[in-house]
């Protein structure tokens, strides 16, 4: 991933230095277990533990000749360890190192993402309570529908963030597995206890069964979860982008001192970070499709997944980490305009209460179809003539023969329409 979108802590997990360091951790965990079992002389193990290290420049030199990164890595270590290096990598295959180390990286990356996701949920909860009773127009198909509250938008996102936390915890657990089972997963030259003990030392679980690799449904599941979380962030970003439109003006990204919105138009304040998040969510979804393609490999393993994962695993984690960092800042500092929300509620001159009127009529021994026709007829006149819907209803003889003035007034009662907001908040777990 390019530097522009890489935060330091997440970026460090996916550096070459850390990648090789994780490889070394795996090799050392296996050697330690084998030494405990008497399979490596204790003196040799102490020497290995003291001397084992790698040199990235030297790895690159060796790989240029041997065309194999794990062999180059092991050769670099051997040059530092000397004769006792013969005990390193005993009974193992390259993917024992690669896949187990990748699991360690994914676990670390997943925990960083989880922390930011939990913070997002906390911010959403705070803002939901803040705007719980702030009335605004609800829209379907982009058209004014019925009143809602701005707090309910945050409550919806809060609830979804909770589901994503559950998903991510499960996906981290699923991908936190190692395999030290040899060339085709049969433990032909290793004892199964070596795998179990080494994985325990590394803080992960052994895969119950493996081939030459850990099966890629685990990685696909993990990237699926990242893409779904990205979908929530895009949902929030798209909503803010719509609400920031000039003709809507209900909410906007914070615009800092000295910030400029356009090279040509000095007046512009654009939702650029939300737009960036929308674009990044597309990348997350495209990476998921590639991860799904990696599941079906030849027999006990081919290498077609390897080149792909060198890109999609770092990039997806780095992207989502950055997206969460940005959306947290956006939501926490979101500029909200309740006055414009109130003004927008009045744009349709009362048409947003048409369903309440329809239902009131159906309770007066009139068919739903006839009631719908009565309300729609008046509503269309309101649209065409720019009239106030309630005033037209008050003077509509066809409607007045069924409903009293008090009954009509009740249909246009905003407070009554929003009477269940507190109950929704309680059900979500915010109140």
Per-region residue spans from a language model:
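Alpha-helix N-cap/helix-initiation motif
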Residues: 16, 113, 150, 218, ...
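A helix-coil-helix interface module used to build multimeric assemblies
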Residues: 1-187, 191-197, 206, 259-262, ...
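Amphipathic alpha-helical coiled-coil segments and their boundaries
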Residues: 99, 106, 110, 154, ...
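Acidic, glycine-rich loop-and-beta core segments that form the ion-binding/anion-interacting portion
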Residues: 195-288
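Alpha-helical support elements that line or immediately flank enzyme active sites
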Residues: 32, 105-117, 226, 230-235, ...
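Amphipathic alpha-helices that form helix-helix packing interfaces
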Residues: 33, 113, 117-120, 124-127, ...
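Glycine-rich cofactor/substrate-binding loops
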Residues: 1-22, 62-66, 83, 265-431
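Short, well-ordered beta-strand elements within core beta-sheets of diverse protein domains
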Residues: 152, 220-228, 356-364
């Amino acid at each position: 991933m390019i530097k522009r979108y890489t935060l330091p802590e997440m970026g460090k997990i996916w550096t070459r230095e850390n990648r090789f360091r994780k490889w070394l951790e795996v090799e050392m965990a296996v050697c330690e277990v084998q030494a405990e079992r008497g399979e490596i002389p204790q003196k040799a193990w102490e020497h290995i533990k003291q001397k084992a290290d790698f040199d990235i420049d030297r790895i690159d030199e060796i790989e240029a000749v041997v065309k194999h990164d794990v062999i180059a890595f092991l050769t670099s270590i051997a040059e530092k360890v000397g004769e006792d290096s013969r005990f390193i990598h005993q009974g193992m295959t390259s993917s024992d190192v690669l896949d187990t180390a990748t699991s360690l990286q994914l676990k670390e990356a997943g925990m960083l993402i989880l922390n930011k996701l939990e913070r997002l949920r906390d911010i959403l909860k705070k803002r939901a309570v803040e705007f719980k009773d702030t009335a605004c127009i609800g829209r379907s198909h982009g058209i004014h529908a019925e009143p809602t509250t701005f707090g309910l938008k945050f409550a919806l996102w809060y609830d979804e963030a909770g589901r994503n936390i559950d998903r991510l915890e499960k996906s981290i657990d699923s991908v936190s597995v190692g395999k030290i089972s040899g060339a085709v997963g049969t433990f032909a030259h290793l004892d199964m206890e070596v795998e179990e003990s080494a994985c325990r030392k590394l803080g992960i679980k052994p895969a119950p069964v493996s081939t030459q690799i850990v099966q890629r449904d685990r990685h696909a599941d993990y990237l699926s979860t990242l893409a779904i979380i990205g979908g929530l962030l895009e949902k929030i970003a798209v909503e803010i982008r719509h609400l920031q439109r000039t003709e809507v003006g209900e909410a906007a990204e914070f615009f800092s001192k000295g910030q400029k919105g356009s090279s040509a138009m000095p007046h512009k304040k654009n939702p650029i970070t939300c737009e960036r998040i929308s674009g990044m969510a597309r990348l997350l979804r495209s990476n998921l499709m590639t991860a799904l393609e990696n599941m079906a490999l030849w027999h006990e393993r081919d290498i077609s997944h390897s080149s792909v994962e060198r890109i999609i695993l770092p990039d997806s984690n780095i992207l989502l980490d950055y997206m969460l960092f940005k959306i947290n800042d956006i939501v926490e500092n979101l500029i909200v305009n309740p006055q414009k929300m109130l003004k927008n509620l009045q744009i349709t001159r009362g048409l947003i209460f048409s369903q309440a009127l329809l239902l009131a009529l159906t309770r007066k021994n009139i068919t739903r179809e006839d009631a719908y026709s009565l309300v729609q007829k008046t509503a269309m006149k309101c649209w065409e003539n720019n009239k106030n819907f309630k005033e037209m209803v008050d003077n509509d003889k066809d409607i007045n023969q069924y409903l009293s003035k008090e009954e009509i007034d009740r249909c246009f009662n905003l407070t009554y329409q929003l009477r269940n907001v507190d109950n929704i908040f309680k059900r979500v777990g915010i109140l």
